[in-house]
């Protein structure tokens, strides 16, 4: 059996009870070393998937399964959001290896807690958009930032803080320039940091803070007073 476990946003206490039990009892653990807090995996035998190909990951899973043992594939946050698990699940189906997915606390939820904000407010917005800028992974034309911004809903942008100036400029095509923005770096980790501003000045503030990755960009009037 292979379990895909969402490890939460970073704080080891955000790992679910079920996820902790599976990790504690696993024979083999595969995780991305740069993304998952090592404290989650104390006293475990692990493979760091950061330098492994999909084929290498599957080979470890096959070997463990052949021995009648259990593999836990640990993903940061929740595996269903930018977790790239579909190709692994499809491959396991072809190999006849049973699997299940255990949800985790996503970084966008930890970010809301860190900011002590609510994404959905009466008379402000009842919609939350989770998205990312296009890069190595393309984005459908209908889901480009300029199109999504037209809703002027709460928007949470993953994997894009390294292009914050371009991001803010593109959002200003639909959001007012004074729309509040908060960038949350490593939500729930000890080094967590929050940078606030507007679509006009957030890029300068984020660059001054030296934040280039591992941060969420949150946009919308939910951040207002």
Question: Language-model features: where?
Answer:
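Class I S-adenosyl-L-methionine
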Residues: 1-105, 202-203, 215
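Short, solvent-exposed amphipathic alpha-helical segments in soluble enzyme
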Residues: 18-22, 41, 88-91, 117-118, ...
